[in-house]
Amino acid sequence: MRAVLRLLSTHTVFSPIETIVSVFVLATLAYFHILSGIKHSSFFASSHPPAIRPAFAHLTNGEWVAVSQHDWTEAWKHPGGSLDALELQQVVFTLDDKTQPSAVLDASAISQHLVSNVPALSGKAYSSLCHHPNVSGTSCFTSVSGPGASPILTLSFKPGTRDDWLGSLRKEKTITLDGVKYDVGAGKRQESIGDMESSKWVAYALSALVLRFWELTKADSLDILVVLTGYILMHVTFMRLFLASRALGSNFWLSAGIFSSATISFLFTLPMCRSMDIPLDPIALTEALPFLVCTVGFDKPLRLARAVMAHPNILKPQDDGRMKAAGDVILEALDRVGNMILRDYALEIAVLFVGVNSRVGGLKEFCAVAAALLAMDRLMTFTLYTAVLTIMVEVRRIKKVRDMTKARSRSSSITAVTANGTAIRGVLSRKSSKQSVTEPETTKNLRQRATDSAIGVKGSLLKDGGRLQEAEENPMARLKLLLIASFLTLHILNFCTTLTSATANARHQRHPFRTVQEVVPIPRVDITTPAIANILSHLAVAQEPMFTVVGSEPIELLVKVAAPVYVHALPLAPALRASNTNTGEAIENFMSSWSSLVGDPVVSKWIVALLAVSVALNGYLLKGIAAGSGLAAMRAVRSQGVRFRSRARSIVKISDEPEPEPEHSIDPAPVVFFASAAPAVEAPAPAPAPEPEPPVNRPPPLTIFSRPLNLETVDKKLQDALPIRSPPPVEPITPESREVEPTQVEVRSLAECVDVFENGPRPVSVALKTLNDEEVILLCQTGKIAPYALVKMLADFDRAVRVRRALISRASRTKTLENSLVPMKDYDYARVMGACCENVIGYMPLPLGIAGPLKIDGLMYPIPMATAEGTLVASTSRGCKALNAGGGVTTVLTADGMTRGPAIDFPSIVRAAEAKAFIESEDGYATIREAFESTSRFAKLQKIKCALAGRTLFVRFATRTGDAMGMNMISKATEKALDVLSHEFPEMVVLALSGNYCTDKKPAAISWIEGRGKSIVAEAVIPGKVVKSVLKTTVESLCNVNTKKNLIGSAMAGSVGGFNAHAANILTAVFLATGQDPAQNVESSNCMTLMEPTNGGEDLLMTISMPCIEVGTVGGGTILEPQGAVLDLLGVRGAHPTNPGQNAQQLARIIASAVMAGELSLISALAAGHLVRAHLAHNRSQLNTPMPSRPHTPGPEDVSHVQQLPTPSASDDKGVTAQGYVVEAK
């Protein structure tokens, strides 16, 4: 377990500040997560539902009077009398909160849309469901308020028809009209606690919390007593922590560090429990909090603190006079007590798991939270808490040095230097010494004595010198474990058996919990509000013609006013919301957001706490620097200022001349030496000539002088003592300079290099750093280092590439690679190694061009193309221009499924047929699908196609693979599926995981018919005038060339999937630019290009069908930064955050659209006869064809024109007659 502990704590103890800051940042994020969960939970929500009941009104004698629902129902159920019933429904439109305060909303358009275009669920229009205010009229009673912040649409309905129409409206959910998006039911509602401001939220939360706790007054007094006892024990635990920390010499910081570690563990535990679906109730957490504190306890962090304080080198130097690094002190303390701490954690978590499996309500959740909290507390103890202890050790050392420096200055004592220049260690390096100066004990006043008697003497457990006395193991941990086990046992028995008459079930039955819903009435719609009263008055005016006498009784009106429906209006274009926003308002909004963030009650406290800790810690560190580690450092501070030196420079000898003896003898005084965290490695280097032995009385490398030093002189001597290394040449390396290069760089013999390699510092990469490249090449050439293991041995990607390049070059016949123009520098080889390529010697750059942009499904996309073919990007751009003029390209995804087709052998065709039938059956397919999809959360099996060839069964799995191209994913899933199939057919033999039934990287009719990867169909309409002006041809000519070339010509050639002009050209260029597998252009380029006239022959209708585009945006070449940057340009890099597979599908749509642009441009060029001229102008190599060529047969008279090519093999291959020669054409 020590290895595990060191793995967790090594980084934290040597980088404590970074660890603490990182953990506090994560804790802040966890706090925001918890805060969001609390604000949007139902705990603080109102205990009654926010629904509002409808109101009922009766118009009699020109006045509206509230009536009951029974009266309105009677008028509805018994029509034909003097009463007429109807329903009113108001639709309130609200603007987005981010719009300007002065913005208004015109609801006339959306109101007309709702009335005219939204039918009821039954299919009836609103006009047939509405209420007519008079008998002869045909218009409905509808009212719309004028433009404003919240306009209101009022609709009238016949009785019983409002719900039919309202259900249809709510089914719409969203309506987009005139650039505005309307969300039905998402408008203004009762403000929830999640929407409140910080101050209002705190007040509301406190009031809701008080009300919730007030509801607990009906709880049993025994339960309240148990909770009260728990809180008392929790505060006793806090007091024990404070007293134990004070006994270890810390009044505040140790206990604060332990408490902060536990608090952060609790903050991390709550989101973790939420993700694990452990129910968390604030009331239950409040009741369980004291028991959680007692369960976690602080005995384990205190045990680790005692082990640190008991370390012999916490304040005492080592034998070489240097202080052991604080991180090493913490790690050695962990080695001593870490296993016991882990044992206690494991036992407590194991006991809590018994409670988790007890199936007792309440106890199960408490034990689950407590176990998770203990696990997180264990992690924080070995990470955050160890970093805090490291800082405490450093601060304690600095404080001790400062106190001793003050004592020396009071006694006017200085540091003594012995005859050989070694400073005498003081009281910190001795347990007891007669020469040590004993500080006089100060007389404590009454207040100090009272404090010591009440809370204990500070540092009472520490020896003289500040080190903890050895103590036996505290039995408190075992006692706590026993109490937890007893608590769980009694709780389970008290719940499951009737030991007494006052069990938990009996108390619950005698005191049932009453909710607020039983006493709080549900509110009604208020008909006296101005919005409703105004509508009712308008209805009364419109209804006056109906108040005629029929017989002798006037017709009266009863109205049901339902709760309003809110519709949220959100402008789609950001410019609409921010059209009036100037720079000053933007800055004001930013400052307001920042003020609200900083004004958060917890964030502001974190900032203040961190600032206070930073100021206090910086004060200690600056005082420690000022105090120094000895009198010489203190004098240097006074005279020359503070200078920081690394350990590597401190070992350089300052002078070869002996220093004069000090004039005065000095008393011994303590001196503390601080060492860096990692020791410097001194590698053996060859010396050009032996040097004479130095004198015996030579001072050691590190000497503390009794007189002030001139820092400028010391710096000059240090620079002179450093070895001088010549910089590498900046001019290009030529073959001549390469030949003399070994004489310029001294190369050690093979024996010396092998000695450094085998006996040098470990790991081996450190030893190889002391060898130059030529010496490493020598080791590789002699077989000591394998070329494929250079990266592992050197631990340097760039150097490994450089060395491998030299090895391959010198072993080749031409020996030109080492100094060739193949680039090597400024490349991130870390992403390549182990993922994309092996035996890397550089990289091959390709020109990257951008065609377009092209409008695809309403959005503009640039088309990245990596190619070395001239006119390709320009031609594709011309096609994009023509397609954009016609409105762009529309694409559809018809299928998405990567395939893998293994070959399986059976002993007979009968068993092979049975296996085929099993796979194609419902039960067999379900079994294989379950096994297949268990290997990845992205692998979703679409279908299985089987085929028999003798005794061999071929199974073609088609799978959705998310945003990855999916070959690795589906191969792993296929292996799992075949393993499950072998349980049903043990005699089967898997011949090959890929039996070429996929078919991968090979042309095949099955891929053309069934599809593989993404199947895309694209369509576009190009106007005839664009065909003439941009493409310089006609619609009739294009259709004729396409039919004769792409369809008839390909059919004559017997092509499979090759019914196109040059789809592979564009597809491969995009593949190379976006990091796809270029080998898969074989099947991905399967394409059928169709053209036909439309709109009476005036325009051109063009379609592209590509059934097997195999692309991905995750893995493979997409991990390389250049290719990833191109995917960023398209907005499809990585996995889609919400819809897996959407990024890869979008990339396939872009590729198909780009192919359409390239096809359109090339066929137009063929139809117009521009192809040859374009290639002669843009894609013809002038160096290789200096003159226009024409048919010519060389004869005997042409021998004089024979020239020899300057090939590297010309000097080696004698008598070559055909190779290396060319005949000029005349």
Swiss-Prot record:
<dbReference type="GO" id="GO:0005789">
    <property type="term" value="C:endoplasmic reticulum membrane"/>
</dbReference>
<dbReference type="InterPro" id="IPR023074">
    <property type="entry name" value="HMG_CoA_Rdtase_cat_sf"/>
</dbReference>
<dbReference type="GO" id="GO:0004420">
    <property type="term" value="F:hydroxymethylglutaryl-CoA reductase (NADPH) activity"/>
</dbReference>
<feature type="region of interest" description="Disordered">
    <location>
        <begin position="683"/>
        <end position="702"/>
    </location>
</feature>
<dbReference type="InterPro" id="IPR053958">
    <property type="entry name" value="HMGCR/SNAP/NPC1-like_SSD"/>
</dbReference>
<comment type="pathway">
    <text>Metabolic intermediate biosynthesis; (R)-mevalonate biosynthesis; (R)-mevalonate from acetyl-CoA: step 3/3.</text>
</comment>
<dbReference type="Pfam" id="PF00368">
    <property type="entry name" value="HMG-CoA_red"/>
</dbReference>
<keyword id="KW-0560">Oxidoreductase</keyword>
<dbReference type="GO" id="GO:0006696">
    <property type="term" value="P:ergosterol biosynthetic process"/>
</dbReference>
<dbReference type="InterPro" id="IPR009023">
    <property type="entry name" value="HMG_CoA_Rdtase_NAD(P)-bd_sf"/>
</dbReference>
<feature type="active site" description="Charge relay system">
    <location>
        <position position="869"/>
    </location>
</feature>
<keyword id="KW-1207">Sterol metabolism</keyword>
<keyword id="KW-0756">Sterol biosynthesis</keyword>
<feature type="compositionally biased region" description="Polar residues">
    <location>
        <begin position="1201"/>
        <end position="1210"/>
    </location>
</feature>
<keyword id="KW-0472">Membrane</keyword>
<comment type="similarity">
    <text>Belongs to the HMG-CoA reductase family.</text>
</comment>
<keyword id="KW-0443">Lipid metabolism</keyword>
<feature type="binding site">
    <location>
        <begin position="1179"/>
        <end position="1180"/>
    </location>
    <ligand>
        <name>NADP(+)</name>
    </ligand>
</feature>
<feature type="transmembrane region" description="Helical">
    <location>
        <begin position="373"/>
        <end position="393"/>
    </location>
</feature>
<feature type="binding site">
    <location>
        <begin position="936"/>
        <end position="938"/>
    </location>
    <ligand>
        <name>NADP(+)</name>
    </ligand>
</feature>
<feature type="domain" description="SSD">
    <location>
        <begin position="223"/>
        <end position="391"/>
    </location>
</feature>
<dbReference type="GO" id="GO:0008299">
    <property type="term" value="P:isoprenoid biosynthetic process"/>
</dbReference>
<feature type="transmembrane region" description="Helical">
    <location>
        <begin position="224"/>
        <end position="244"/>
    </location>
</feature>
<comment type="function">
    <text>HMG-CoA reductase; part of the first module of ergosterol biosynthesis pathway that includes the early steps of the pathway, conserved across all eukaryotes, and which results in the formation of mevalonate from acetyl-coenzyme A (acetyl-CoA). This module also plays a key role in the biosynthesis of triterpenes such as ganoderic acids (GA), a group of highly oxygenated lanostane-type triterpenoids which are well recognized as a main group of unique bioactive compounds in the medicinal mushroom Ganoderma lucidum.</text>
</comment>
<feature type="compositionally biased region" description="Polar residues">
    <location>
        <begin position="434"/>
        <end position="445"/>
    </location>
</feature>
<dbReference type="InterPro" id="IPR000731">
    <property type="entry name" value="SSD"/>
</dbReference>
<dbReference type="InterPro" id="IPR004554">
    <property type="entry name" value="HMG_CoA_Rdtase_eu_arc"/>
</dbReference>
<feature type="transmembrane region" description="Helical">
    <location>
        <begin position="481"/>
        <end position="501"/>
    </location>
</feature>
<dbReference type="InterPro" id="IPR009029">
    <property type="entry name" value="HMG_CoA_Rdtase_sub-bd_dom_sf"/>
</dbReference>
<keyword id="KW-0812">Transmembrane</keyword>
<feature type="binding site">
    <location>
        <begin position="963"/>
        <end position="971"/>
    </location>
    <ligand>
        <name>NADP(+)</name>
    </ligand>
</feature>
<keyword id="KW-0753">Steroid metabolism</keyword>
<keyword id="KW-0752">Steroid biosynthesis</keyword>
<feature type="compositionally biased region" description="Pro residues">
    <location>
        <begin position="685"/>
        <end position="702"/>
    </location>
</feature>
<feature type="transmembrane region" description="Helical">
    <location>
        <begin position="337"/>
        <end position="357"/>
    </location>
</feature>
<feature type="active site" description="Charge relay system">
    <location>
        <position position="1077"/>
    </location>
</feature>
<feature type="transmembrane region" description="Helical">
    <location>
        <begin position="17"/>
        <end position="37"/>
    </location>
</feature>
<feature type="region of interest" description="Disordered">
    <location>
        <begin position="428"/>
        <end position="449"/>
    </location>
</feature>
<feature type="transmembrane region" description="Helical">
    <location>
        <begin position="252"/>
        <end position="272"/>
    </location>
</feature>
<feature type="active site" description="Proton donor">
    <location>
        <position position="1175"/>
    </location>
</feature>
<feature type="binding site">
    <location>
        <begin position="1174"/>
        <end position="1175"/>
    </location>
    <ligand>
        <name>CoA</name>
    </ligand>
</feature>
<feature type="region of interest" description="Disordered">
    <location>
        <begin position="722"/>
        <end position="742"/>
    </location>
</feature>
